[in-house]
Amino acid sequence: MSSSRSNNRATCSRSSSARSKHSARVVAQTPMDAQLHAEFEGSQRHFDYSSSVGAANRSGATTSNVSAYLQNMQRGRFVQPFGCLLAVHPETFALLAYSENAAEMLDLTPHAVPTIDQREALAVGTDVRTLFRSHSFVALQKAATFGDVNLLNPILVHARTSGKPFYAIMHRIDVGLVIDLEPVNPVDLPVTATGAIKSYKLAARAIARLQSLPSGNLSLLCDVLVREVSELTGYDRVMAYKFHEDEHGEVIAECKRSDLEPYLGLHYPATDIPQASRFLFMKNKVRMICDCSATPVKIIQDDSLTQPISICGSTLRAPHGCHAQYMASMGSVASLVMSVTINEDEDDDGDTGSDQQPKGRKLWGLMVCHHTSPRFVPFPLRYACEFLLQVFGIQINKEVELAAQAKERHILRTQTLLCDMLLRDAPVGIFTQSPNVMDLVKCDGAALYYQNQLWVLGSTPSEAEIKNIVAWLQEYHDGSTGLSTDSLVEAGYPGAAALGDVVYGMAAIKISSKDFIFWFRSHTAKEIKWGGAKHEPIDADDNGRKMHPRSSFKAFLEVVKWRSVPWEDVEMDAIHSLQLILRGSLQDEDANKNNNAKSIVTAPSDDMKKIQGLLELRTVTNEMVRLIETATAPILAVDITGSINGWNNKAAELTGLPVMEAIGKPLVDLVIDDSVEVVKQILNSALQGIEEQNLQIKLKTFNHQENNGPVILMVNACCSRDLSEKVVGVCFVAQDMTGQNIIMDKYTRIQGDYVAIVKNPSELIPPIFMINDLGSCLEWNEAMQKITGIKREDAVDKLLIGEVFTHHEYGCRVKDHGTLTKLSILMNTVISGQDPEKLLFGFFNTDGKYIESLMTATKRTDAEGKITGALCFLHVASPELQHALQVQKMSEQAAMNSFKELTYIRQELRNPLNGMQFTRNLLEPSDLTEEQRKLLASNVLCQEQLKKILHDTDLESIEQCYTEMSTVDFNLEEALNTVLMQAMPQSKEKQISIDRDWPAEVSCMHLCGDNLRLQQVLADFLACMLQFTQPAEGPIVLQVIPRMENIGSGMQIAHLEFRLVHPAPGVPEALIQEMFRHSPGASREGLGLYISQKLVKTMSGTVQYLRESESSSFIVLVEFPVAQLSTKRCKASTSKF
């Protein structure tokens, strides 16, 4: 399948490398960026931004111009004046380059008549160590030997002459080390420790807030982040920018001063942030401009250097002229920009070796802060913000993955339904039935051109125009199986301009040599919503020429003038899959011209599918039982009452309690007293469908194990469900933590004899390591050496994060930056004195084997109680436990397949119902007695009620009380008799009589409303009462109390009170709670009551449950307009049914 070129960007399937596609876009955009830069430099004040963006898209710079542009971006010769820069040789510390203001900032400039020595105090070749006091140059020397020097920033140093404090921020370049020096504000408490370990505290509250947010809400996540960054930094405006697939950007969240113009929803062209700048954001995650109007300071360097030094990673890099003008145009003087990076998309070329490669990173977006006056943020606070952005990146990763999974699930569901239609009516069915091809991917219209006939949906070109597109495809793209483009104009279709605003983008597939399916998209601008004042008048001398967010928006609209929203890879995969299905189900006319019939793909019968599903379920169940019994991890299970119904060999071995003796005992009787509440919590949560993770329980020991003390287990609770998804029990997959807790208890008792624990040679000792409060490794026990492959001498005195566990080729490599960020959060949380959660932590040992573990960390204290570091344990799950968890997932999938069978049964019930309706229609004209007609009428109402329930596919609308209610005229007594008929089988089986108590006028009462819903709720309440009533307790009474109200002169409202009374004690309280507060783990009866209560609420009514000393009652209050009310007055009657 071919794709047209739009902005030199190819649309391809996910099987192609996402990295390659991104590289292609970078290569395509960079000449445009260079062209814009050259035009700005050449025209300055007369630079017309909006028109230049459009021109740059049509023409690019020469190769030499691009090279000069990139060198200017990465090797600029100026820095901002709020600090000074020194570039040194990494071994001798000889000065290679320095900013002109360095001598003044370091107090090296003479105050009297200068001497030769003073003038040469700072020059190329100077030993930089002589500029600082002894402890400072020692710290700089030590940092220079470190592999990833960035992890040590900032380093507190003091100038030799004045003692003035600076933060030294170091990074490596091709010729040496760059040291950025930023003055420390005297009123700020300087950070005396190196690294991020202290900066974490500044952002701890914001990090905790981000981590507490629920998943699945990207908008909330971004809104909270901009507020937290605003509070941390104090900038006037904080915005979250997101880069879209085609590289253009959008403001998706904003927190600003009330008097500033909003930019929320603004889109801007890809060229607004050049690719070279994006590269710099990947190199230097935080970029601060203190004052865009300040005069930049020149860098002086050694003449022997062949090119200007790279300042990509410098915190002092001066803004380029065009960026400074952009800021000035929008009234901004200072800014702080932080990059948001996420894991790069992986190729779908199979899983082989995928675990052996660390994931790459890509720029997801930016966090941009602006201020209307000069503003300086100290480096520790910027570091804290960077750490916060790393946590945000982890959250974004989750959201991106969840969104992708949700989209794929939607497409798979739609494809399944479309396939079902194709089996009955291919290919027309996917246009004439619901869902249709427009549900497969987001589009504005679709068309099927099949056997010279046309079927259309939504906004499409005319029939003549579609035929012209078909002819164009056959002439110019005959060798491909289809085409996708976001711009028919740029794809070269000659009639694109004539299509107007209806169609800009198109995806087309061939289903035979002459037949096509089309998806159409309209203009991109239709999707754009900007919170700013894009329609406000612009200054007469501006007219969009000035660089400003408003002109960026105008430029963006110009760039996408002839373009639709791009087709995503997952969408093209779905379209291509449908094409394969269609081409397989239809015989191509060219292949067999004599046979124009459709070729139907034969599907296996439903019975065979059910049998196959049962066999699969049985196989999985048998395998799971075998694994549970033989697993080296303790596994136990209970039913909904909390009684043991599963107890594997390992659990019996640890506790000394044989399997046969454990079965049937309440779990709370087998745990020690302080675990009883934990077990009850787990069971209560499981009944609500909530599966608790990583909870600790202590089991009693018996027989030969009785003297060994309790068995301490870390358990994960898994809900066991039946075919109707009802929770029927809880399975506990556990890990024996007894040995670790013995060590922890010993560690707590001895309060400081950490070395005795770590060096204990016992095999029961788990992998243990210790760090100090600066993050350096102090101890590394034998078990850690075995599991990691790193010797103790190679780990001790190294930074845990950056030297021991790293994202580089040395140490124990982790998969991605997110893993290191999570580890850093854990360590910082412990050292700050908080109790952290356990961390699922994975890394590659020195042999390349991937190790998955659960990490526990606890604080270390000295004799005075001061926190001095952390003690950490690793718990590595056995292969059997991992296999058991995998089989559990397979079991859940099998249960889901069974649930699909229930959906099938629901579908098949509709045919017998239709047969019953047909039989009823035949009986209605027959000569029936009055009693027979009443019975037939009740039967009809039962059928209609069942049919309505079968159509309730959208339970959410019922829960939200906006489901549609029917409005028909009905007789109230007929509806009540139908309710009683539904309860009769259960009533006779339990020998419980049902009394009815209502006035005679009810038989004459004709109301207007949804009688079937009324029947449904009353029958459900009545069935629930029968379930919890015993024969000897007395009858159930259905009582109706009507009250009439006249509305005006021609309308009456019947206020009805239905009381369903049964003997005490009545329905269990837990079930009544489920009726009003539904949870995922609700019982079948609770779900029925909950739905009925919501239906009554939808009818503008209420439900109550009243408990009295001798009876309990459901009280339903509803009202209906009166359709016809007999004036005949009847005496009240009480009778049995």
From Swiss-Prot:
InterPro entries in the cross-refs: GAF, GAF-like_dom_sf, HATPase_C_sf, His_kinase_dom, HisK_dim/P_dom, PAS, PAS-like_dom_sf, PAS_2
Bias kind Low complexity: ranges: 1-18
PTM comment: Contains one covalently linked phytochromobilin chromophore.
A molecular function (GO) term: protein homodimerization activity
Domain PAS: 620-690, 750-824
UniProt family annotation: Belongs to the phytochrome family.
Name of the protein in question: Phytochrome C
